[in-house]
Amino acid sequence: VRAALSQLRGAFALGFIFAGEDDLMIGARNGPPLAVGHGEGEMYLGSDAIALGPFTDTISYLEDGDWVVLNRKGATIFDKDNAIVHREAIKHTTATALVDKANYRHFMAKEIHEQPEVVGHTLARYVDMATERVTMPVKLPFDFKDIQRVSITACGTASYAGFVAKYWLERLARLPVELDVASEFRYREAPLRKGDLAIFISQSGETADTLAALRYAKAQGTHTLSVVNVPTSTIARESETVLQTLAGPEIGVASTKAFTCQLMVLASLAVAAGKARGELSEADESKLVHGLVEIPRLMSEALTSEPQIEKLAREISKSRDVLYLGRGTSYPLALEGALKLKEISYIHAEGYAAGELKHGPIALIDEHMPVVVIAPYDKVFEKTVSNMQEVAARGGKIILMTDAKGAAEATIQSLVTIVMPDMGATFAPMVYAVPVQLLAYHTAVVMGTDVDQPRNLAKSVTVE
């Protein structure tokens, strides 16, 4: 095996078993994650803590180039130079958390309904509710006053969390933000200023392209900060600073609670940045923190719309295509809504900035096209109403997600209006994510797809 490994090129995580050898297993890693699980008289090989969770609560992560020989008594780890090395055994807490679906049909449904609780846990880590101040759980190794530009890099749903954070950081901290999908960032040779901040977002902390982007940024001399759900992951271990989301294990392939917990962390970071840069007064900070504290309660209220959304899903399931529209921070949520629907129901869906409707998507509108409009009442609401009028004039079916004031102001005949609780527009994406997720979930249930493990998708994309 050692001789064969020396000839391999590219990324791999391998496990070898041998005929006639029931007490021998060999593993090797180069790129994708690989971990050793330690038990009593038993040893395991798996991708990460989630995979090994049902069997053991003690794991050692292999590093790139490592290979390991296991038997029931233990493991011997070698590095790329074939020298024996020690990799620390870490205790983790996912073993008991996987449990089951409780009374839910799918893990995704359970995870959607867990959001008020886990977002509340994440909130408590980043906000002092008594003083109404944001408190980072770790000391940041930089001063936001010295940061001239922020880059945010992620993939899939995490990139849409980053897109929302771009609005927050630019508005609250007056920091210019560049957003990239990791698969593009790592190859476009972006010039990064030494001492600026690069943020990387990943639920698993093992996303291959995001990890490669992190390594590129480190080589450029930027400060690196990761937002991850698995604090022992490769991205977490290689980042200068880690901000953990407290979503708990997320089993459904389509991310739900990890997304909203990422938003809570990023919102807290944006407020902290605004305060540090002198863009927010103490009164401003208190007002924003009060808004964050309300989010778990508002998410619980948003969940009460489920019976209405379940009914609507039966209509959506008859469609071949669905369009999602939003402005401001609702635009990234429109992208996320379209991604969720196509991921688990296999219905083609596209998300657009509402102002781009007349630049192409309007050609698709007819009586068969549902258009989901995400529009809390804010300073651009009237412009979004104008877009809805254009859709209605062409026979499109409008599904409006808004608050009570928005529902009263929008006099257009719509297929259905899903009324969300009243709240400020700044942090609305965390609450409006709930009906967006429920719509995708119930549509997929009607379609009869495998909601938790949709075809062709994996929970963690650990290869390019």
Task: Outline where the language-model segments fall.
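Acidic/histidine-rich
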Residues: 11-42, 312, 317-343, 378-380, ...
